[in-house]
Structure formats: C-alpha cells, structure tokens
Design a protein with these regions (language model features):
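Conserved ATP-binding/catalytic core of the eukaryotic-like protein kinase fold
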Residues: 1-154
C-alpha cells in the first residue's frame, strides 16, 4: 500500500514517491534530524512476515551498510514503524542506465568509464562479502560524478 505524503517513519517524513518494484516502494523523504533528503525503501509485508527472510534482510543490511565506496549508494539506516520495515539510503540524483539507453547507445568513452566504475564498486562489495543480487541497467544510476550501484537486492 503506497504511503501518503507527510507519513512519518521514525524521523523520516515522506515527500514523494520515486518508484516501485518487486522488492518494495521507494520514496524521497526528509531526515528531520539531519535536515537532508534521503531515499526510503519500504519493504513488502510478506518479506518481513517470514522470519528467515527477515533475518537475511537484516544480515545483508548490516553488510551493505559497511560499504563505503564512491560508486555504491550508501545505506544510512534501517527501521521499523509499526508493521512497516524500511531502509534509508543516500538520495542519488540522475537517471538510470536503463533510462539513458532508451535514447541510444552510450559513447565508447562512457562505456569504458562507467564499466570501470561499476567493476570497481562490485570488487569492493565482493571483498566485503556482499553480492549484488539484482545487477541490471535499472540499478545503475548515472550522476554528474559517474555511475552508482543501487539496490543490492535487499
């Protein structure tokens, strides 16, 4: 069920929807403690109702939160508000690689640059024991600073 604008999840106030997929809905939200905008991913209820999936989610969230890399979206927080479980992540502005590819192929120089950035990010994650479970163009955000990996399948 979509969250209404103004809904509070702990210190995070929902501002607008950003997207939805099989693993939940993502919203732009305001961190009222730190005064910054963040992305909040609300997880489906069936995920949190299953104890094994909930434990896996919490393990993976802990592992992902340890990743510090310029080309990996930072996980800031996890929380529960009533029966709603959520992740709080860095808000990454830009367009996904999937969106960009609808306008045609990338120049070879961009393919090399973004490919190297994604490979470096994946190497860092793998060295930390974290596997990206949903690597696809829709989970690569292109920003002014380069490529950022999103959504490690949490």
């Amino acid at each position: 069920m979509p969250l209404a604008v103004g809904t509070r999840l702990g210190p995070y106030e929902i501002l607008s929807p950003l997207g939805a997929g099989g693993m939940g809905e993502v919203y732009r939200a305001r961190d009222t403690r730190l005064g910054r905008d963040v992305a909040v991913k609300v997880l489906p209820g069936h995920l949190m109702a299953n104890a094994e999936l909930r434990a896996r989610f919490e393990r993976e969230a802990r592992a992902a939160s340890s990743l510090n890399h310029p080309h990996i979206c930072t996980l800031h927080d996890v929380g529960h508000e009533g029966d709603i479980a959520y992740l709080v992540m860095e808000l990454v502005e830009g367009e996904t690689l999937a969106e960009r590819l609808t306008r045609g192929p990338l120049p070879a120089s961009d393919v090399v640059k973004f490919g190297a950035q994604i490979a470096d990010a994946l190497d860092r994650a793998h060295r930390a024991g974290v596997i990206h479970r949903d690597l696809k163009p829709g989970n690569v955000m292109l920003t002014k600073a380069g490529a950022k990996l999103l959504d490690f399948g949490l």
